[in-house]
């Protein structure tokens, strides 16, 4: 995975901002704490593609972004992990 551009810290991303994953421009619907551990937080960024009406998620731990950033695509009722080649925001 290559983070090609960061217009701001990932923690500052909010509803209405855009993230481009593998060349696909996705809009942020929500960004929140999924699980709060005492030393770190597992974060979720809910994304959608308005052209295809598909839903996606970015998941990461607040203290280990580079090592833990994962991308998921909603298939039926379950999110499945998908490969990230390039990402920017």
Language-model regions, residue ranges each:
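Mixed-charge, low-complexity intrinsically disordered regions
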Residues: 1-89
């Amino acid at each position: 995975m290559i983070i090609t551009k960061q217009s701001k810290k990932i923690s500052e991303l909010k509803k209405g901002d855009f993230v481009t994953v593998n060349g696909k421009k996705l809009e942020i619907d929500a960004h929140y704490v999924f699980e709060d551990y005492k030393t770190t937080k597992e974060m979720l960024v809910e994304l959608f593609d308005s052209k295809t009406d598909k839903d996606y998620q970015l998941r990461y731990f607040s203290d280990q972004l580079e090592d833990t950033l994962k991308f998921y695509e909603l298939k039926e009722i379950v999110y499945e992990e998908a490969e990230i080649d390039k990402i920017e925001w």
